[in-house]
Curated annotation (Swiss-Prot):
The gene is rpiA. One of its GO terms (molecular function) is ribose-5-phosphate isomerase activity. The active site is at E110 (proton acceptor). SUPFAM superfamilies: D-ribose-5-phosphate isomerase (RpiA), lid domain (SSF75445), NagB/RpiA/CoA transferase-like (SSF100950). NCBIfam families: PRK00702.1 (NF001924), rpiA (TIGR00021). Keywords: Isomerase. It comes from Chloroflexus aurantiacus (strain ATCC 29366 / DSM 635 / J-10-fl). It catalyses: aldehydo-D-ribose 5-phosphate = D-ribulose 5-phosphate. Pathway: Carbohydrate degradation; pentose phosphate pathway; D-ribose 5-phosphate from D-ribulose 5-phosphate (non-oxidative stage): step 1/1. This is Ribose-5-phosphate isomerase A. The keyword Magnesium does not apply. Gene3D superfamilies: 3.30.70.260, 3.40.50.1360.
Amino acid sequence: MNTTSTETRKAMAAAAAVALVRPGMVIGLGFGSTAAYATRMIAERLHQGDLNDIVGVPCAEGTAQLARELGIPLTTLDEVAAVDLTIDGADEVDPQLSLIKGGGGALLREKMVAQASRRVAIIVDDSKLSPALGTRFALPLEVVDFGWRATARWLEAQGGTVQLRLRADGQPFRTDQGNLILDWKCGPLNDPAALAAQLSARAGIVEHGLFIGLATDLFVAGPDGVQHVTTSDCGTIAW
Protein backbone atom coordinates (compact mmCIF):
# COMPACT_ATOMS: atom_id res chain seq x y z
CA MET A 1 0.00 0.00 0.00
CA ASN A 2 1.36 3.43 -0.94
CA THR A 3 1.51 5.70 2.09
CA THR A 4 2.97 8.85 0.56
CA SER A 5 2.42 11.84 2.81
CA THR A 6 0.23 14.80 1.96
CA GLU A 7 3.31 16.99 1.53
CA THR A 8 4.89 14.46 -0.81
CA ARG A 9 1.71 14.38 -2.88
CA LYS A 10 1.62 18.16 -3.06
CA ALA A 11 5.17 18.13 -4.40
CA MET A 12 4.30 15.42 -6.93
CA ALA A 13 1.38 17.43 -8.30
CA ALA A 14 3.50 20.58 -8.44
CA ALA A 15 6.28 18.83 -10.35
CA ALA A 16 3.82 17.56 -12.97
CA ALA A 17 2.45 21.06 -13.54
CA VAL A 18 5.87 22.74 -13.60
CA ALA A 19 6.78 20.43 -16.49
CA LEU A 20 4.43 22.60 -18.58
CA VAL A 21 6.60 25.70 -18.07
CA ARG A 22 8.65 26.73 -21.08
CA PRO A 23 11.29 29.43 -21.66
CA GLY A 24 9.88 32.88 -22.39
CA MET A 25 6.60 32.31 -20.57
CA VAL A 26 4.72 34.69 -18.31
CA ILE A 27 3.84 32.50 -15.33
CA GLY A 28 1.09 33.13 -12.79
CA LEU A 29 2.48 32.15 -9.39
CA GLY A 30 -0.25 30.92 -7.06
CA PHE A 31 -0.56 31.25 -3.31
CA GLY A 32 -0.63 28.56 -0.64
CA SER A 33 1.43 25.61 0.51
CA THR A 34 0.95 23.54 -2.66
CA ALA A 35 1.59 26.45 -5.03
CA ALA A 36 4.76 27.24 -3.07
CA TYR A 37 6.20 23.89 -4.16
CA ALA A 38 5.66 24.91 -7.78
CA THR A 39 7.26 28.32 -7.24
CA ARG A 40 10.35 26.70 -5.72
CA MET A 41 10.58 24.18 -8.56
CA ILE A 42 10.29 26.94 -11.17
CA ALA A 43 13.13 28.80 -9.43
CA GLU A 44 15.24 25.64 -9.41
CA ARG A 45 14.76 25.13 -13.15
CA LEU A 46 15.49 28.82 -13.75
CA HIS A 47 18.80 28.65 -11.90
CA GLN A 48 19.72 25.40 -13.65
CA GLY A 49 19.38 27.20 -16.97
CA ASP A 50 16.34 25.24 -18.16
CA LEU A 51 14.11 28.33 -18.24
CA ASN A 52 15.24 31.53 -19.89
CA ASP A 53 13.35 34.82 -20.05
CA ILE A 54 10.48 33.74 -17.81
CA VAL A 55 8.71 36.24 -15.61
CA GLY A 56 6.25 35.64 -12.80
CA VAL A 57 2.98 37.34 -11.89
CA PRO A 58 2.41 36.70 -8.17
CA CYS A 59 -1.13 36.16 -6.88
CA ALA A 60 -0.37 37.45 -3.38
CA GLU A 61 2.15 39.53 -1.47
CA GLY A 62 3.37 36.35 0.22
CA THR A 63 4.03 34.76 -3.16
CA ALA A 64 5.86 37.87 -4.36
CA GLN A 65 8.13 37.75 -1.30
CA LEU A 66 8.92 34.06 -1.84
CA ALA A 67 9.60 34.58 -5.55
CA ARG A 68 11.96 37.48 -4.85
CA GLU A 69 13.85 35.40 -2.29
CA LEU A 70 14.19 32.65 -4.91
CA GLY A 71 15.35 35.04 -7.62
CA ILE A 72 12.35 34.78 -9.96
CA PRO A 73 11.86 37.98 -12.00
CA LEU A 74 8.43 39.48 -11.39
CA THR A 75 5.97 41.68 -13.22
CA THR A 76 2.33 42.69 -12.78
CA LEU A 77 -0.92 42.19 -14.68
CA ASP A 78 -0.70 45.83 -15.76
CA GLU A 79 2.57 45.17 -17.57
CA VAL A 80 1.71 42.04 -19.59
CA ALA A 81 -0.82 41.39 -22.33
CA ALA A 82 -1.63 37.94 -20.96
CA VAL A 83 -0.37 35.24 -18.63
CA ASP A 84 0.70 32.09 -20.48
CA LEU A 85 0.25 29.65 -17.61
CA THR A 86 -0.88 29.96 -14.01
CA ILE A 87 -0.10 27.23 -11.49
CA ASP A 88 -2.15 27.37 -8.31
CA GLY A 89 -3.73 25.18 -5.68
CA ALA A 90 -7.36 24.77 -4.63
CA ASP A 91 -9.29 23.96 -1.49
CA GLU A 92 -11.94 21.85 -3.21
CA VAL A 93 -12.42 20.57 -6.78
CA ASP A 94 -15.52 19.02 -8.33
CA PRO A 95 -15.68 16.75 -11.43
CA GLN A 96 -16.41 19.77 -13.66
CA LEU A 97 -13.09 21.33 -12.55
CA SER A 98 -14.97 24.04 -10.70
CA LEU A 99 -13.11 25.15 -7.59
CA ILE A 100 -13.39 26.65 -4.17
CA LYS A 101 -10.34 28.79 -3.45
CA GLY A 102 -9.48 31.41 -0.87
CA GLY A 103 -8.31 29.39 2.11
CA GLY A 104 -5.24 31.60 2.18
CA GLY A 105 -7.28 34.77 1.64
CA ALA A 106 -5.86 35.65 -1.80
CA LEU A 107 -8.99 34.82 -3.81
CA LEU A 108 -9.37 38.22 -5.51
CA ARG A 109 -5.87 38.40 -6.96
CA GLU A 110 -5.86 34.67 -7.70
CA LYS A 111 -9.04 35.03 -9.74
CA MET A 112 -7.76 38.12 -11.57
CA VAL A 113 -4.58 36.31 -12.58
CA ALA A 114 -6.52 33.17 -13.57
CA GLN A 115 -8.90 35.20 -15.74
CA ALA A 116 -5.91 36.76 -17.50
CA SER A 117 -4.33 33.35 -18.19
CA ARG A 118 -4.35 31.28 -21.34
CA ARG A 119 -3.98 28.12 -19.27
CA VAL A 120 -4.65 27.46 -15.58
CA ALA A 121 -3.13 24.36 -14.01
CA ILE A 122 -4.53 23.44 -10.59
CA ILE A 123 -2.40 21.24 -8.35
CA VAL A 124 -3.90 19.27 -5.46
CA ASP A 125 -3.60 16.08 -3.50
CA ASP A 126 -6.58 13.74 -3.69
CA SER A 127 -8.04 14.96 -0.37
CA LYS A 128 -9.25 18.08 -2.23
CA LEU A 129 -11.54 16.16 -4.59
CA SER A 130 -15.25 16.43 -3.89
CA PRO A 131 -18.43 15.29 -5.68
CA ALA A 132 -19.94 18.76 -5.06
CA LEU A 133 -18.38 22.05 -4.00
CA GLY A 134 -19.15 23.00 -0.42
CA THR A 135 -19.13 19.40 0.77
CA ARG A 136 -15.70 19.60 2.40
CA PHE A 137 -14.81 23.28 2.56
CA ALA A 138 -16.46 26.55 3.53
CA LEU A 139 -16.80 29.15 0.78
CA PRO A 140 -14.60 32.22 1.44
CA LEU A 141 -15.93 35.66 0.53
CA GLU A 142 -13.90 38.86 0.58
CA VAL A 143 -16.11 41.66 1.91
CA VAL A 144 -15.75 45.33 2.82
CA ASP A 145 -15.90 46.41 6.46
CA PHE A 146 -18.99 48.53 5.91
CA GLY A 147 -22.05 46.45 6.72
CA TRP A 148 -20.19 43.15 6.92
CA ARG A 149 -22.59 41.85 9.57
CA ALA A 150 -25.50 42.66 7.24
CA THR A 151 -23.72 40.73 4.50
CA ALA A 152 -23.24 37.80 6.89
CA ARG A 153 -26.94 37.84 7.79
CA TRP A 154 -27.91 37.86 4.12
CA LEU A 155 -25.67 34.85 3.49
CA GLU A 156 -27.13 32.93 6.42
CA ALA A 157 -30.62 33.71 5.13
CA GLN A 158 -29.64 31.75 2.02
CA GLY A 159 -28.74 28.80 4.28
CA GLY A 160 -25.76 27.63 6.30
CA THR A 161 -23.57 29.50 8.78
CA VAL A 162 -21.03 32.30 8.44
CA GLN A 163 -17.90 33.05 10.43
CA LEU A 164 -15.65 36.09 10.29
CA ARG A 165 -12.12 34.82 9.66
CA LEU A 166 -9.74 35.65 12.49
CA ARG A 167 -5.98 35.58 12.84
CA ALA A 168 -4.22 33.56 15.52
CA ASP A 169 -4.22 36.62 17.80
CA GLY A 170 -8.00 36.91 17.57
CA GLN A 171 -7.98 39.99 15.34
CA PRO A 172 -9.85 39.97 12.01
CA PHE A 173 -7.90 38.51 9.11
CA ARG A 174 -7.14 41.10 6.43
CA THR A 175 -6.58 40.42 2.74
CA ASP A 176 -3.84 42.10 0.72
CA GLN A 177 -6.48 44.71 -0.15
CA GLY A 178 -7.28 45.29 3.54
CA ASN A 179 -10.69 43.64 3.38
CA LEU A 180 -12.34 41.03 5.61
CA ILE A 181 -13.03 37.37 4.86
CA LEU A 182 -16.30 35.61 5.67
CA ASP A 183 -16.24 31.81 5.60
CA TRP A 184 -19.66 30.51 4.63
CA LYS A 185 -20.51 26.88 5.35
CA CYS A 186 -23.20 26.56 2.71
CA GLY A 187 -23.24 22.80 2.20
CA PRO A 188 -23.06 20.93 -1.11
CA LEU A 189 -23.84 23.24 -4.03
CA ASN A 190 -26.25 22.03 -6.69
CA ASP A 191 -25.54 24.94 -9.06
CA PRO A 192 -22.21 26.68 -8.32
CA ALA A 193 -22.45 28.88 -11.43
CA ALA A 194 -25.83 30.29 -10.41
CA LEU A 195 -24.58 30.98 -6.89
CA ALA A 196 -21.45 32.65 -8.28
CA ALA A 197 -23.62 35.03 -10.31
CA GLN A 198 -25.80 35.78 -7.28
CA LEU A 199 -22.80 36.54 -5.07
CA SER A 200 -21.16 38.71 -7.74
CA ALA A 201 -24.31 40.83 -7.88
CA ARG A 202 -24.43 41.44 -4.12
CA ALA A 203 -23.06 44.82 -3.00
CA GLY A 204 -20.50 44.51 -0.23
CA ILE A 205 -19.06 41.26 -1.54
CA VAL A 206 -15.79 42.18 -3.24
CA GLU A 207 -15.13 38.65 -4.52
CA HIS A 208 -16.15 35.06 -3.81
CA GLY A 209 -14.12 31.88 -3.82
CA LEU A 210 -16.02 30.07 -6.57
CA PHE A 211 -13.79 29.61 -9.62
CA ILE A 212 -16.05 28.46 -12.44
CA GLY A 213 -14.74 27.67 -15.92
CA LEU A 214 -11.21 28.86 -15.18
CA ALA A 215 -9.20 25.67 -14.63
CA THR A 216 -7.96 24.08 -17.85
CA ASP A 217 -5.79 21.40 -16.25
CA LEU A 218 -5.92 19.54 -12.95
CA PHE A 219 -3.00 17.58 -11.54
CA VAL A 220 -4.11 15.27 -8.71
CA ALA A 221 -1.55 13.38 -6.66
CA GLY A 222 -2.78 10.21 -4.99
CA PRO A 223 -1.52 6.79 -3.91
CA ASP A 224 -1.05 5.70 -7.53
CA GLY A 225 0.82 8.79 -8.69
CA VAL A 226 -0.34 11.93 -10.48
CA GLN A 227 -3.46 12.05 -12.64
CA HIS A 228 -3.75 14.78 -15.28
CA VAL A 229 -7.34 15.83 -15.94
CA THR A 230 -8.37 18.44 -18.52
CA THR A 231 -11.64 20.14 -19.38
CA SER A 232 -12.16 17.62 -22.18
CA ASP A 233 -12.49 14.94 -19.49
CA CYS A 234 -15.41 16.69 -17.77
CA GLY A 235 -18.56 14.63 -18.00
CA THR A 236 -16.59 11.39 -18.08
CA ILE A 237 -15.02 11.54 -14.62
CA ALA A 238 -16.35 11.23 -11.10
CA TRP A 239 -14.89 11.13 -7.60
